[in-house]
Regions:
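Short pocket-lining segment of the protein kinase catalytic domain that shapes the ATP-binding cleft
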Residues: 10-18
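Activation segment
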Residues: 17, 146, 154-156
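ATP-dependent phospho-/nucleotidyl transfer catalytic cores
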Residues: 19-44, 51-131, 142
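Conserved protein kinase catalytic/activation segment
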Residues: 139-148
Length: 213
């Protein structure tokens, strides 16, 4: 995006030759170059906006610029609160799964404690300028290229939030392939790509982050 407030002009790049990554993975399509691109994005964005790289005054200005109470409230509620409470207003449960939810999510006090720790960290640890919604539905891909969209949830929070969101979505894609694809070479190749991508997402992010310090 490019916005010129003087000319009242908004320019957007044409991405018609890209496709939504989540939809592409539902079709069991793989993107071998994706892990290099996404780890570069995460390292530059997360570490590049942290105290380890930028001066404190610059970080304070960015923190102020990206104060985002309304979207942060959505994250705090939909990620860290509602999934673990018996809230049928937001939790639309497939009835055969209800007993699982009641036992494993609503009734697990140890899980509630760990989630509360994560929520407290999200509220109080402004470590990096995160994307805030870095799932595969916010990524457009084609072979050899990637674009990250939907930055409206950006704020200062723990860097691990974005990394974990990405890993979780890749894991969901693996589970989808495991349960919906016929056994054979195509399934093995797609699962293998996902497993390699998950592993490299951590290793390359660490490597590229250290290179920025």
């Amino acid at each position: 995006y490019l916005y010129d407030p003087i000319m009242c002009c908004l320019c957007m790049e044409d991405l018609k030759d890209y496709e939504n990554m989540r939809k592409a993975m539902i079709k069991h399509r793989s993107f071998p170059g994706f892990v290099e691109d996404i780890t570069t994005f995460m390292a530059n964005t997360l570490i590049g906006t942290s105290d380890a790289v930028i001066p404190a005054p610059e970080k304070r200005n960015l923190t102020k610029q990206f104060m985002n109470p309304s979207c942060c409230n959505i994250t705090e509620r939909l990620v860290y609160t509602d999934p673990y409470t018996d809230n049928d207003h937001n939790n639309k449960i497939f009835e055969p799964n209800r007993s699982f939810f009641e036992k494993e999510l609503y009734g697990d006090e140890r899980l509630h404690l760990e989630v509360a720790k994560l929520k407290e960290a999200f509220l109080s640890n402004g470590q990096s300028l995160i994307h805030g919604d870095l799932h595969t539905g916010s990524i457009m891909v084609k072979q050899g290229a990637m674009m990250v969209l939907d930055p409206e949830f950006a704020c200062y929070a723990p860097a691990g939030y974005d990394v974990g969101n990405l890993i979780a979505n890749l894991t969901f894609a693996w589970a989808n392939a495991e349960t919906t694809m016929q056994e054979g070479a195509e399934k093995a190749a797609f699962r293998g790509w996902l497993e390699e991508t998950i592993e490299k997402s951590i290793d390359l992010f660490r490597e590229k982050s250290l290179a920025l310090l």
